[in-house]
């Protein structure tokens, strides 16, 4: 079920930069958003289907650089990361988790972004 929900969110939500702390109902209505919107909607749908889900926040390595990113983890006997923006299940090793919790915790990471020094070996 988690894979089908991830696939649906990936296909149905237009990838568009958004500055907000979204809720799932708004995302369902607008059908657009960035990683925050995708994650909030995926988590709500997964939980409605009886699958424990949580938000994780960190960075992802894309096109030669690290960028702020949010994605989901679902409980499938262990916590498994998945990314409904990048269509990954499980999410690959380019995802570096800094914290978990709901989207409103992302403020805790903002002071790190821009000050991080990450070396890819």
Regions found by a protein language model. Give the residues of each.
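C-terminal extracytoplasmic interaction modules
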Residues: 3
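Active-site neighborhood of thiol-dependent amide/isopeptide-bond enzymes
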Residues: 6-70, 74, 90-91
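Active-site rim recognition segments
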Residues: 7, 11, 66-121
């Amino acid at each position: 079920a988690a894979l089908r929900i991830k696939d649906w969110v990936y296909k149905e939500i237009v990838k568009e930069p958004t500055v907000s702390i979204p809720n799932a109902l708004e995302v369902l209505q607008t059908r657009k958003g960035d990683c925050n919107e995708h994650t909030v909607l995926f988590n709500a749908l997964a939980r409605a289907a009886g699958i424990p889900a949580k938000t994780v926040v960190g960075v992802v390595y894309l096109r030669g650089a690290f960028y702020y990113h949010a994605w989901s983890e679902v409980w499938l006997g262990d916590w498994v990361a998945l990314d409904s923006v990048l269509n990954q299940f499980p999410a690959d090793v380019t995802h570096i988790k800094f914290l978990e919790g709901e989207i409103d915790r992302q403020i805790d990471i903002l002071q790190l972004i821009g000050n991080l020094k990450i070396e890819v070996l």
